[in-house]
Amino acid sequence: MNPYRQIPRFAFVAAAVASTVALHSQQTGNGPASAPAAKTLTAADCTAAKLGSEIPIKAIGEPVSAVTLSAPQWHAETANAPGYCGIEGSMAPVDKGGTARPIRFGVALPATWLRRGAQLGGGGMNGSIPMLAGGVGRGQPSLLSQGFATYGSDSGHQMSFGMPGRGMGMPGAPGLAAANPAADQWALNDEAIANLGYMQLKKTHDAAMVLLQRVYGDLPRYNYFFGSSQGGREALTVAQRYPEDYDGIAAEVPILSFSTLMLAPELIRIQEKPLANWVTPAKVNAIRGEFMRQCDKLDGLTDGVINNYMACRAIFDRKQGDPNRNPWIARRCPNNVDPNPQDTSSSACLTDGQIATLEMVYSPYVFASPLANGVRSFGMWVPNTDPSGSGLIANVRYRGQEGAADNAPVHGHLGVLGVTGFLFRDLTANPLDYVEGGALNKRRMELSAILDSTNPDLSAFQKRGGKLIVVIGTNDTLASPGAQLAYYQSVLDELERAAVDSFARFFVLPQTGHGLSGTTYNTDGDGKSITVRPIPNVYERLSLITDWVENGRAPGKSVAVTAGERSMPMCSYPEYPKYSGGPAGSASSYTCAAQ
């Protein structure tokens, strides 16, 4: 039996790892604590003699066959970062006869260490070591300059933004780049998939702890995880699988239902196999105009911003409310005939087939069988002002769709290797051949158990004193806001509100995208042209989590975010910023309200 086929977590934890956990878990973050004494190192300490050339495999809490270290390198102080010792290493896979790759990891050891550790998550499909000398917020200083030792890995494969070869087909592109079978073979290996899913996180953490002990003679008093997108999924993964290893976790825009997120663009193209169901780019203005018409004023202010995301989702989610209602009726083509398919105006009409596709995109997708953690559906997307973003609307017909040319491209997107490689186990497969509940159903369940960060039971992390902050944006077209909102709700259902509020904050930034940035729409819900302004989105990501962990100062249920002189409250799910009167650009003019 292949041990990586479906294994939620290895039971084995070496004695060295157990002692590491105990040491850096003594401070639980339940109240103020004295500042840890600084530890220092110099270039003279940054040597192979001190750091070694290998790490014993018994110190790593998930299976590896060897851990080797490269020669450390001293980096002199710059304007952006202090002097630090950088070291990289490689963890050899257990499956030596297959296509598993080594995990390449890095650790940055600052000249002045305040016994803070920070594991940094990846992005895309991973494939490179994160930038360890940077910060974790917009315009924030280096973590190294704030006394953190940082570490991260490429997750067990080597790529450029996670996608060479077949994976380079980006959303909205005509198709896939030329296949590169040698580069993509890792996607056929279950150990490599398990490394991407979760094992590399534990392996990298444990290796970093060994190196910190060697160079400083101590371990972190406070250990953190910071990640966005794929890194956000990884942040939630460690909260769910390795809660004893971290004191504070900050995640942004997590792709938590990862196995289905990679499949979701294909599900839309499958829905559009009949030519009549194809939503063309010409319809973009009509779609977002209808969202704005029905939802802009739901927050009490007609200003080109859909703040009341829950009420808006309820309107366009056909699985809520009266199944016979049609939220698109105002845009339906008379007699189901489009008199001008090239009309790009906000008054363009939609055929019944196009409406059916939009209903599919903006309602949860129900699975044939429950996936990991009993998840029965994927939340898809919520109404937004970028309905064509990330290839949600395609401008060509793909192989397998009605009306496509014989030489039409195979559909591709950022996560397509997760479909052709992980799921089909055939890099030449056409992803549009997928059938829900068909021959690949068992494999879907296996991959979900490895890749999805959807376990709502965070009680182990709560009980050890851990603190968690998650932020999502409702205009995100790369991640799935619908899936993120469903996860928020599942945690509340599992633990109840009071318990969740004691250790976690689940924030939502309406009308912001995958980078948590966004703007007002140029036409408000009354059809009036308005000035486009940035959505306030700047907040103190680092201090929010460190203050909570190290000083016991919990963030409020709402946090002010800014954009220049403008400000808004960032509210906790399921609340939204409701206009209560006063200057529209001031946070004091809003209250966080539920439905």
What is the meaning of each model-derived region?
Residues 470-472:
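Short beta-strand/loop motif that positions the catalytic acidic residue
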Residues 232-243:
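Short glycine-enriched nucleophile-adjacent loop
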Residues 218-229:
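Alpha/beta-hydrolase fold nucleophile elbow
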Residues 124-217, 263-264, 428-450, 512-531:
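Cap/lid segment of the alpha/beta-hydrolase catalytic domain
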Residues 2-24:
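Gram-negative bacterial Sec-dependent N-terminal signal peptides
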Residues 26-116, 129-138, 302-306, 315-425, ...:
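Catalytic-loop region of hydrolases
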Residues 478-482:
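Conserved alpha/beta-hydrolase "acid-adjacent" motif
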Residues 241-244, 248-285, 308-310, 392-393, ...:
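Hydrolase active-site cap/lid region
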